[in-house]
Amino acid sequence: MTSLSLLIALVAVFGCVYNSTKSKYIPYVIEVDKLGHVAAASGPLEISTFSNQRVIQATLADFIEQARTVTPDVSIQRKLIFKLYDKMNQSDPATLKMNEFLNGDPEKNPYKRAEKEMVNVEITSILAQSDTTYQIEWDESTRTRTGSLKSKAHWKALITIYIVDSRDFTEEMIRSNPAGIYIENFSWTKI
C-alpha cells in the first residue's frame, strides 16, 4: 500500500513539473475596429513568426539608411549611428568594417561630411540571395548645405545576417534589437 502511495505521489510530482515547463501564455494578434469589436484575429503565433522576410527587409533597409545618411543635425546623426551599432555584434566582421568606414577616411566620416553636404538614402530593392544573404540597392542624393543637388548615385550591397533567439535577451537588448536580427558582414559599391 505504501509503494502504491509513493508511486501516485511521484506521478503527481512529475505531472506538476511537466505542467510548470509549458508556456502559460499563447500570443495572438487581434485587430479591433473603432468600437472595440474584433475585426480580425490570427491563430497562435510561433516564436519565429516575427523574423519573417518583411521584418528582415525592414532591418536591412534601416541598416543601410543609418549607415549612409548624412544629416547636419549632430543629435540625429548620433542616434542613427547608435541604432546602426545595435544591429551588429562586436565580434562580427561587420563591426570592424563599419568602424573603418565611419572613422578611417575623414571624407567618409558623417560628422565631417555634414559640414559641407547632406546625403539622403532611398532604398529601391531588397532581394534574398540565400537564407542569410541579401542584395540591397538604393539611390543616394548628395546635396550641398544650401540644398542644391550635388550628385546622385546608385549603390548595391550584399549583407549577411543571422538571427539570435530573443527569448534570452535582457530588457536593454529587447529595446535595441527586438527581432534579434544581426548583420554579420556586408560589402557595398557604387554602380
Regions found by a protein language model. Give the residues of each.
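Solvent-exposed, amphipathic alpha-helical segments
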Residues: 59-70
